[in-house]
């Protein structure tokens, strides 16, 4: 089974899969060993690994290289976070050609204007017009060479302060333009607008994807009951690694020794195993 077929099966309506946000080959292998179904090549994670904001700073080539390493390091399908598609329809078409050629299973593009800002930060968010983003999706689908390559349309209506009716209108238009799945994003604390969207979505043949970063009390099972088939845990691995590295390194500088952290860190044999 190809990785693209694996991704299509993972997001198919009727089941519930989970994806881990990863930012390099090591985090990809750890996610695979933990039992995740899909890898999310996180734009935030890749940007953070380069110590730059998630604001369209890195180039497509840099994001693609990170996704390629993840793909080559594991047996799991990679769904790549491609922000707004790195430009207009021509840029989107080239992006699809490059990602598909690299073996990536699918891409996700969001309906914000370029350059984008991270959805969970402060400040206003500007959405692309429905027609403009639909044209990008159509260009993406026209550019793909294999039938099973996946293009996910990410809707930022709730992030931009919009209402469910706009989100559904956008979803309908994006599916008509060729989107294989819809990702609806939100930074609500309770996730109720996401669950409401899922229950209101009438296209039962089109998969729904959620990213429960700001509403962690909503479980994957809760999302499944509302009609979703993929939950992306987009940045938890990144945040966990920051906490662990910070605590360990501060302990070393305080003690002038690594003795007290040794029971808390991975053994070298575990590192070697991850380099298999």
Swiss-Prot record:
Pathway assigned in UniProt: Antibiotic biosynthesis
Keyword annotations of the record: Antibiotic biosynthesis, Isomerase
GO biological process, one term: antibiotic biosynthetic process
An MF annotation (GO) of this entry: isomerase activity
InterPro entries, per database record: ICL/PEPM, Pyrv/PenolPyrv_kinase-like_dom, Pyrv_kinase-like_dom_sf
Active-site residues from the entry: 54
Entry's EC annotation: 5.4.2.9
Catalysed reactions, as listed in the record: phosphoenolpyruvate + H(+) = 3-phosphonopyruvate
Gene3D superfamilies: Phosphoenolpyruvate-binding domains (3.20.20.60)
Keyword Isomerase set for record: yes
Disulfide pattern: none
Pfam families: PEP_mutase
Family: Belongs to the isocitrate lyase/PEP mutase superfamily. PEP mutase family.
Function, in words: Isomerase involved in the biosynthesis of the phosphonate antibiotic FR-900098, a potent antimalarial agent that acts as an inhibitor of 1-deoxy-D-xylulose 5-phosphate reductoisomerase (DXR), the first enzyme in the nonmevalonate pathway for isoprenoid biosynthesis. Catalyzes the conversion of phosphoenolpyruvate (PEP) to phosphonopyruvate.
The protein, known as: Phosphoenolpyruvate phosphomutase
Organism annotation: Streptomyces rubellomurinus (strain ATCC 31215)
Lineage: Bacteria, Bacillati, Actinomycetota, Actinomycetes, Kitasatosporales
